[in-house]
Amino acid sequence: MTDAQQHRSILARVGEVLLIVGVLDIGVMIYCIMKGISYVSSFNIFAVWLGILLMRGSLWAASVVRFFSAFFLASGIGLIAIFPFLQPISLTLAEVRHISPFTVVLPLLLLPLSFWTARELNREPVLGALQASGKSVSPLVFPVLLGFGLVAAVGGVVAFT
């Protein structure tokens, strides 16, 4: 398989997964609305749109998804690490009793998805295609630091106010 075929198959595979996850997220959102359950997600329509673009071989979409996958992974891990320090544990336990399981489970499932997506889009055939198209390919250090930095900044503001 040539590099062109390899990068297109990687983009298609990642696109299919994002499309499926986006459609499932939209389905969960509709279910929660119909049942009056609280549910917040802004992942759904973007996952569908970027999934379709990736399936069509868009290197722009690959670059965007690569960046935001690393950002979401870092900020998600950072949030899990800092969350116990943001409010008393008794308040957290009281809130857990009244939230939908979707509110906890789906964000936790997005962490491994973000890891897998960033890893797939950071493979050599994709990076080579991005470079060949003239797009700058930077290491994922910046989105990772940005994700951790955002969580640290918000956590600092919440903790000291």
Residue ranges and their predicted role:
Residues 1-161:
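Topology signature of small-to-medium multi-pass alpha-helical membrane proteins
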